[in-house]
């Protein structure tokens, strides 16, 4: 499975959530609302999730292998670094 497009939109600065990304695979499937988050060890991506009735969050979709997660993270963060600082503007590859 190849990542064929990544779009990143920054959000307002001031908290750990830095941006949202949409990732397209093989020009036929898109994953929306992947989050770019700044943690204690740097930037990472968070998968789209929903809140359960007990208050916990559950991922809607996620990579199965560490290798594919790394591939997704690298692709998203490369585009994030190229994205204009102004929230609302979008960058893509």
Swiss-Prot record:
Keywords: Cell cycle, Cell division, Septation. Pfam families: SpoVG (PF04026). The keyword Glycosyltransferase does not apply. The keyword Cell cycle applies. GO terms for biological process: division septum assembly; sporulation resulting in formation of a cellular spore. Could be involved in septation. Belongs to the SpoVG family. This is Putative septation protein SpoVG. It comes from Treponema denticola (strain ATCC 35405 / DSM 14222 / CIP 103919 / JCM 8153 / KCTC 15104).
């Amino acid at each position: 499975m190849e990542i064929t497009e990544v779009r990143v939109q920054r959000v307002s600065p001031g908290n750990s959530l830095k941006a949202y990304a949409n990732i397209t695979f093989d020009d036929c499937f898109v994953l929306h609302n992947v989050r770019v988050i700044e943690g204690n060890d740097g930037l990472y991506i968070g998968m789209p999730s929903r809140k359960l009735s007990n208050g916990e969050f559950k991922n809607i979709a996620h990579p199965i292998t560490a290798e594919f997660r790394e591939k997704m993270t690298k692709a998203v963060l490369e585009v994030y670094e190229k994205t204009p600082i102004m929230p609302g503007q979008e960058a893509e590859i």
